[in-house]
Every structure is written in structure tokens, then in C-alpha cells.
Amino acid sequence: YKKDDLLFEFASEEKATLFGISAKYIDALNNRKVVPKNNHDLSKLRTICSTGSPLSEDGFRYVYNNIKKDVHLASISGGTDIVSCFVLGNLFQPVNVGEIQNRGLGMDVDVFDEKGLSIKNIKGELVCKKPFPSMPVKFWNDDGNKKYKSAYFEKYNNVWNHGDFAKITDNEGFIIF
């Protein structure tokens, strides 16, 4: 199992249409000059989801140049704590290099400045302004919800602060830093 593109071998053999990989794996393949499209039949592959960390602009370009030109690339951002995505891909919108396309279903996601004001095209805090379907309601053994409130609601009153820096673009896409 020392092959850099082993996961693409599995995707090819299984005729995968949806393939999830990490941004770090994409970066590693790029750095090692691996070209999966040359060695694997990825004709069935329609969507690649990238997660784990922000996908760089170079990572976007690598996917389209070396994996598959006509794939839908969906970088996503969320967390295990919410069992969901705050922002993710959307098959009905164009993919813009370096951007995550859309807010997740049921997610009132925004970017705030230090004062708690909504900002655009400026790096700020990724927040969710309203409760969402998979929002945890407490931490185990957290008397009075002190740790829970401190983790997510201390900075902005009654607004979930996820602890990630982000920017909303002119395309209404998101860049996660």
C-alpha cells in the first residue's frame, strides 16, 4: 500500500461516482506530481468532496488538471461537533477556484467582524446566526452549560461562533482560512 494514488485505484475499481478525500491528500499528490487520470479510469466519477482543511487554489487547479476536468469539486467545511457542513458544494452553481459554493441547508451562516457585524470580502469569524438541525445542545457532564457556552456563544451573544476565519466573496461563495 505504498502507492500514492491507491485511493484512485479503489475509486476506479468500484466505479465511484462520489469520492471524498482530504485537502492534505490533494496537496500531497500535487507535491509528488501524481497524475491519477493517467493511470485510472475515472469516467464514472462525478463529484469529489474535499474536507479536513481548506482546499487551496492550487488544490482546485490540481484536481481539474490531474484528476478529472469535468468533475464537480465540492470543498466543504463543518465539523464533527455539528455532524454537518456549514458551507459546501452545490451541483447547480459553478465552481470558483478557491471558494466553497454555498451555505448548508438549514444553516444561517455569515461572517462577522469583531463587533458582530456582517461583513463581505473581508476576513472575519464564521458564525451561524440561528439554531440549526444538528446543533448540539450541551456537553456531557457540563453543569450549567459553562463549557458549551464558552466554546460557541461567548464571543457573540446567542450566535454560534465556530472558531474558523472565513470570507464571503462577491460570488456569495466562502473562503475558509
Model-derived segments and spans:
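Conserved ATP-binding/catalytic segment of the ANL
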Residues: 118-119, 127-177
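Short, P/G- and charge-enriched loop/turn segments at secondary-structure junctions
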Residues: 93-99, 150-154
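Hydrophobic beta-strand positions
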Residues: 110-111, 167
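Alpha-helix/helix-capping structural signal
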Residues: 24-27, 134
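Conserved AMP-binding/adenylation subdomain of ANL enzymes
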Residues: 1-17, 32
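Short beta-strand-to-turn element immediately C-terminal to the catalytic PLP-Schiff-base lysine
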Residues: 86-90, 112-113, 141
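Short coil-to-beta-strand transition motifs
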Residues: 100-106, 160
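Gly/Ser/Thr-rich phosphate-binding loop
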Residues: 16-21, 30-95
